[in-house]
Amino acid sequence: MTAASQISMSARHLGYTRGGPDVPVESLKITNELLQKNHDELHIFFRDMNGHNHLVHNLFTRLALGATPEQLRTAFNDDLPTQRGIPSLDQDVVDKMHDDDFFSERITKINHYNNFMVFFEKEIASKGWQTVVNQYIFSKSRVAEALLPLMYDGAYHPIIHLGLGVEFEQPAVIAEALAQAAAHDSFDTDWFFQSAEQGALESQSGASPSSSESTLLELARETAQDNTIRDAARTPGLIGTMKMKKAIYPKAGKQLLSLASRFRVTKETLKQKTAEMVNFCAYLAGCAQRRDRATKVDFFFMHCVTSSLCLSVLAQQPWIDIADRVRLIEWKGRLDLAWYVTCGVPDLDLDHVKTYQAGVERGWDDIFALVSDQHDDGHVAKFVRALKHGEDICQQFEDGDASKAFPIRGDMWQVIARMAYDSTLNLPPPAKWVIMAGMDQAWVSVPEK
């Protein structure tokens, strides 16, 4: 066992957005114990297709928000029954993974998750986790160019895992994240990102005014007005990443790429564009409602929000070259647009947030306490913490030239957090969220107002 295979949380590394100044020693102890068990014994996929193990996300987030030892153990036990054991290790395979051809042949093969993880643990023990992340994610080698798009696959789960590992400075979790990306199915995110980059380069070199840079809010509005995109977005019978791959890209890929390539980031605008991306995700989550139905947050927009915090963390890392950080945020914003389309281009109305009645007025500390006590697999807690982070980084852009790109402001962040908490409390997982909010069928089982 190496340091790169051990979970070792400390009071010095408790994340960017926290629920209080002090975390009990017992909370740290139980988190280390439970996450070590997860690391050693459990698969990062509880099923082969998009079955993502959320235990790390759940415990890190609840710890940061101030959960008690009892709440942390309950959170772990709530989600444990759905998990499965880690695949067997093949040391011969691990030893051969330094060969890029051998490694590349095994990318997207879920049965190699444990082999990938142990390989990355050894690499981290030898080189340090920052060096390994740069080598395998940002070096633009053949392997890195395969793994980086996979980080965004599966509704952002691998990059959420990586962002948390970096935020809490846990090499073992970073090894898990790299292995998850390497073992993950591809849903053609590589094609989407590469095509969008090529489109951006071509428009910059020749360029009509229509290809100029735009905000995510402007691009979403144009997306909703494109008939080809709308027709693809309303394709029935598919959900999530499979719909993106099988319906959106084939039917409206050209039109979507033309718009997505206009979201651009530079080293000078990185901070502002990161905040814009975070704000846009919150806007999607809060505003995609139906006037005749009870409030619900879209399941995939929730993941856009959750991952926005992790991308913000990565965008602030000085050991990642700024050009790579720019690329991270460009890709995130572009894929958020693709998720808006995949979810059926729902109407987005800020009045749903402005007029939401949350009942008792509560501050962030009260909301953190509520979600820490909620029986949930961590989705609500992650969503709420990401919203608080959004409030923190977007406030400086609420006034001035960029303000139109920041519709979520003031107490709206807390309101959206309460929308998620109120609409998921004491409900079974299938009833907590609406799945693809632009589709009429998604709202059939949601109670009328």
Curated annotation (Swiss-Prot):
Pathway: Secondary metabolite biosynthesis. Disulfide bonds: none annotated. One of its GO terms (molecular function) is oxidoreductase activity. It is an enzyme of class 1 (oxidoreductase). Keywords: Oxidoreductase. The keyword Acetylation does not apply. Pfam families: Questin_oxidase. InterPro entries: Questin_oxidase-like. Induction: The expression of the dibenzodioxocinones biosynthesis cluster is positively regulated by the transcription factor dibT. Its EC number is 1.-.-.-. Baeyer-Villiger oxidase; part of the gene cluster that mediates the biosynthesis of dibenzodioxocinones such as pestalotiollide B, a novel class of inhibitors against cholesterol ester transfer protein (CEPT). The biosynthesis initiates from condensation of acetate and malonate units catalyzed by the non-reducing PKS pks8/GME11356. Pks8/GME11356 lacks a thioesterase (TE) domain, which is important to the cyclizing of the third ring of atrochrysone carboxylic acid, and the esterase GME11355 might play the role of TE and catalyzes the cyclization reaction of the C ring. Belongs to the questin oxidase family. This is Baeyer-Villiger oxidase GME11358.
